[in-house]
Amino acid sequence: MPALKVGNKAPDFTLPDETGNLVKLSSLKGKKVILYFYPKDDTPGCTTQACGFRDEYPSIEEAGALVLGISPDGAKSHTKFKTKQKLPFSLLSDEDHKVAEKYGAWGEKSMYGKKYMGILRSHFVIDEAGKLVDVQIGVSPKDSVRLATDAVRVA
């Protein structure tokens, strides 16, 4: 699958949130969405990214947008993480990483000299028409929050 670029239509998906409710991206048309992929609940970088979006959430809402976090973790892990960090947005479970693959957010990583496949920290800002207005793959947690928040304000 070719890499997603600004101007492309965001691939549709349906995933369960932390309560088991299904979230379908296309049902959010008419709203701006910050969709971010992160490797694992309650780990340092992922907590930094999630809490960054939490702290910016009032200005994100003011811009007419919402945030959806996606990782391979299940509902129980998401519920615990969301509660612990007081996150005001939904966390979606992509346990088979099919949605991450669609978005190019699944790829080869390396830790301590070992290569493995995993989530590449990424975000995608989607406008009201369902088009991508910002695409960042392999972004740092702090840069992700800043860049996505800036993009959603001008989208």
Residue ranges of predicted features:
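Chalcogenol-based redox active-site neighborhoods
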Residues: M1-A155
